[in-house]
Amino acid sequence: KVMNDLLRITKQHNVWIGLVSHLRKMGTAGQSFEEGRLPTVDDIRGSGSIKQISHDILAFARNITAEKEEERNTIKLSVLKSRYTGKTGPAGTCKFDYETGRLHDGLYDDMLDGLNI
């Protein structure tokens, strides 16, 4: 019901609504989300209608256990669903600035050298 209501509002008012969803807890096998594993559509917790009704689904991942501060502060972005283009996959990176609390544009390739992202 909630997702259908949100969809109706977006169409009625020609707006984009961003919805934040938590991830399912995963088993012990493989890389964890805390270690920077990018979520998939199936990792989204909650109603299946989130996956079905959404026009776009974006995923963000950050390795909070990394030793290097630069790596801990680097966020990977990925498009999991795009109803408009159908294109999915890696969408770049951004950096969290603890001093300002802001996200900055992606890192250049030379800055990525040596980072496990």
List each language-model region with its residue ranges:
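C-terminal regions of RecA-like/P-loop NTPase motor modules
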Residues: K1-W16, K25-I117
